[in-house]
Amino acid sequence: MADLLLPLASSPVATQQACFVMVDLVGSTVLAQRLPVDHYAALMAEFVQLLYLSFEAHGGCVLQHQGDAVLAFWPQDQAEAAVLAALDAHGRVARLRLAGLLGLSLRLRGAVTSGEVITGHIGGQLSAYGLPVNFARRLCGGAQPGQTLVCQIVQSGCAASARLEFGLLGEPLELRDFGEICEVYEARRVLRDNQMKVG
């Protein structure tokens, strides 16, 4: 049995600090039940392609997608870009061309986390491993439709942003495998008229 185990790296593996954006399509199972399979497949293909292009336009790197969920990452010092990408995704998906033709209104849940990870290519695809990746999945699952939640590290990293504002959730959020998380924030884009008043 021991012969089947992969050897550990002989030298320390380099880690990096990164931000992760996870977005998930609300109600995708219901859509899969309602739509003909070819329509559903075409919708998901357009959905995923849109998010790939949107996240890359904001400087992110898409790591993977699993059906109705997409995960991307940014260097930790680009937390503002990561949050803006997550927020912009809501509007872009709501305007998805094929969804409009099918008479559908699409909504997302989103989350942004940050921390230490290891990245590398597995099977030709870039992957990331570390607690922030798992946290992003769980935090996204805890968001309400239309909501983008961020952890305290991300909120702190964006504190000086003139384009973002954050509201602390009124109650702790219970997340599977993480327990009760007290400092979770909802991210919002600052409206232009508010920016003009500040200026």
Residue ranges, per PLM feature:
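Catalytic-core segments of nucleotide cyclases and related cyclic-nucleotide turnover enzymes
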Residues: 118-144
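Intrinsically disordered, glycine/charged-rich C-terminal tails and inter-domain linkers
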Residues: 1-6, 10-13, 145-199
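Short loop/turn motifs enriched for small/polar and acidic residues
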Residues: 68, 111-117, 153-155
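Alpha-helical scaffold within the catalytic cores of cyclic-nucleotide enzymes
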Residues: 42-60, 71-110, 131-140
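Catalytic NTP-binding/metal-coordinating core of nucleotidyl cyclase/transferase enzymes
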Residues: 4-81
